[in-house]
Amino acid sequence: MKNILILTLMVFFAIPSFSQKEMPLYNNYHVPNSISAPDEEHAELGEDGILRISKVSFPTLSVYLPPKEKATGQAVIICPGGGYWILAAGHEGADVAEEFAKRGVAAFVLKYRLPSDETMIDKTIGPLQDAQKAIQTVRENAKEWNINPEKVGILGFSAGGHLASTAGTHFHQAQIDNPKKTSLRPDFMVLVYPVISFDPGIGHSGSSKNLLGENPSQELLDKFSNEKQVNAATPPTYLVHAKDDRVSIRNSYVFEAVLQEKGIHVSTTYFESGGHGFGMVNPQSEIIWMDEVEAWLKKHFTNLP
């Protein structure tokens, strides 16, 4: 835990500070679907400058609020990537939240549980429970945080994109206690080089193995191949992907096609090159996808009450 604190302070002081706090996702750390086990969470800042957090079993939500005079009322929950093995918590988490807050969008970094048979009764739903809890938490605290509860979206990178798209296609069934019947449907999704499908030849085998296990049934693979779960209630979506990504751009193509087929609004930024894991800025392009997403949000989510 000492290493985590040091790295957290490093990140905190390295960036301009908006109103922010890290809070337990579940009250009193009463985490559902959990097995009592030692807290082995570990954070490490690699030589490549990437902050990686592993073995997360106690999820948190970090809150980044814009100044009231800049607030748009929009909110986004950010799910870092990492193959359901680690969380790339800096360039796909805190850095992104800071940038959204600068642009007037309240941002929330979700440090979600990483699937483990050692800490979860059913590891396949653990991350989804955390995403649903984050949506519930933001909506139920919308007044305090100066947020319109009808402008709460979710953003995910890579495997975090799989989690975000799972939240956007599996919201009909609550995996958490929801006594107030708060809507668990995100109002929009932003999916950046996402894993969408677990079909062979499209999906990311590492993410599938970490979430579903070594030999998942076809039923389970289909359930979490989110292009197969789209319906008329699926939220509007923005997709960002590079054509040379090792997580095949076919993930985004197939999701885009199904969304269009179902009449769901979808917009895209597809780069000719850029690879995987570039975060907010693709150094091989002059296009800033954050600018594109900001314009998309203003166009489609500004006039809500």
Predicted regions mapped to residue ranges:
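Short amphipathic alpha-helix adjacent to the substrate-entry channel of hydrolases
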Residues: 90-108
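Short beta-strand/loop motif that positions the catalytic acidic residue
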Residues: 238-241
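C-terminal catalytic histidine-bearing segment of alpha/beta-hydrolase fold enzymes
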Residues: 253-305
